[in-house]
């Protein structure tokens, strides 16, 4: 797979990073590309960058690249850089392919500015991929029945490299909920409706109100949306 789109999006996002910044760090392959580029910049320019990672993946990648790890108790992120699995024409996103959507959303909401970086192949007219929902294991059966009443096909995400379900960094299950095409005027409402089900921790819908900008990368360049 050609990764130049991810590289170009990450490279443009790097221009937003200034010495002394506290970064909210999302998760996923594009964020890892960003962190590798950031590591080069830290080494070359002697920058001090602080980071609040949203997953073990980004935690280890940040440490490896010279980012000093801090937390939300003492720090408010100046800028959150994260990826997405789909971005619609209004900049609504679906995230959670890696199961880190709960901490990603917390870090994003705590940040002063949120920038999503994606390969342009993630851009769609309307959201349509299954929505990841983090669920307490105790409530799994109940949540599955309730969420299917909302008109979706729901399935427990199975692990790869292990037997049984995917377990999030928070110790919970992930249920992937296929609502088909999600119309733009339903996105924010659907995000809230899912969260009202007892036992749901969070879901992977990131409505446009949370997003300040999206950077989309192609094989030749990147642009702000």
Swiss-Prot record:
Binding-site positions, substrate? 27-30, 82-85, 95-98, 122
Which keywords accompany this UniProt record?
Answer: Isomerase
Q: Which reactions fall under this protein's catalytic activity?
A: aldehydo-D-ribose 5-phosphate = D-ribulose 5-phosphate
Q: Which CDD domains match?
A: RPI_A
Q: What is its EC number?
A: 5.3.1.6
Q: Which residues form the active site?
A: 104 (proton acceptor)
Query: Does the UniProt entry include the keyword Isomerase?
Result: yes
User: Which pathway or pathways does this protein act in?
Assistant: Carbohydrate degradation; pentose phosphate pathway; D-ribose 5-phosphate from D-ribulose 5-phosphate (non-oxidative stage): step 1/1
Biological process terms in GO annotation: D-ribose metabolic process; pentose-phosphate shunt, non-oxidative branch
What the entry lists under Gene3D superfamilies is as follows: 3.30.70.260, 3.40.50.1360
Cellular-component GO terms for this entry: cytosol
Task: Please tell me whether the keyword Isomerase is annotated for this protein.
Answer: yes
Q: Which domain of life is it from?
A: Archaea
**SUPFAM superfamilies listed in its UniProt record:** D-ribose-5-phosphate isomerase (RpiA), lid domain (SSF75445), NagB/RpiA/CoA transferase-like (SSF100950)
Supply one GO molecular-function term.
ribose-5-phosphate isomerase activity
> Which InterPro entries does the UniProt entry name for this protein?
NagB/RpiA_transferase-like (IPR037171), Ribose5P_isomerase_typA_subgr (IPR020672), Ribose5P_isomerase_type_A (IPR004788)
PANTHER family for the chain: RIBOSE-5-PHOSPHATE ISOMERASE
Task: Give the family, as the similarity comment puts it.
Answer: Belongs to the ribose 5-phosphate isomerase family.
Q: How does it assemble?
A: Homodimer.
Q: What does this protein do?
A: Catalyzes the reversible conversion of ribose-5-phosphate to ribulose 5-phosphate.
Please give the name of this protein.
Ribose-5-phosphate isomerase A
Q: State the species of origin.
A: Archaeoglobus fulgidus (strain ATCC 49558 / DSM 4304 / JCM 9628 / NBRC 100126 / VC-16)
């Amino acid at each position: 797979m050609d990764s130049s789109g991810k590289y170009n999006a990450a490279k443009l996002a790097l221009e937003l990073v200034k010495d002394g910044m506290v970064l909210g760090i999302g998760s996923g392959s594009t964020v890892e590309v960003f962190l590798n580029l950031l590591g080069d910049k830290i080494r070359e320019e002697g920058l001090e960058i602080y980071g609040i990672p949203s997953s073990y993946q980004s935690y280890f990648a940040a440490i490896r690249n010279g980012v000093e790890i801090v937390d939300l108790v003492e720090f408010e992120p100046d800028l959150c850089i994260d990826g997405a699995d789909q971005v619609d024409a209004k900049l609504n996103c679906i995230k959670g392919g890696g199961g880190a959507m709960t901490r990603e959303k917390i870090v994003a909401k705590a940040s002063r500015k949120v920038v999503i970086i994606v390969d342009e192949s993630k851009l769609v007219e309307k959201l349509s991929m299954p929505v990841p929902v983090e669920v307490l294991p105790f409530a799994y059966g109940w949540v599955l029945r309730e969420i299917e009443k909302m008109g979706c096909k729901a399935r427990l995400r199975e692990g790869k490299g292990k037997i049984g379900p995917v377990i999030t960094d928070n110790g919970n299950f992930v249920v992937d909920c296929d609502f088909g095409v999600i119309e733009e005027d339903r996105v924010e409402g659907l995000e809230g409706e899912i969260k009202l089900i007892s036992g749901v921790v969070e879901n992977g819908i990131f409505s446009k109100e949370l997003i300040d900008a999206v950077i989309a990368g192609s094989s030749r360049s990147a642009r702000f949306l």
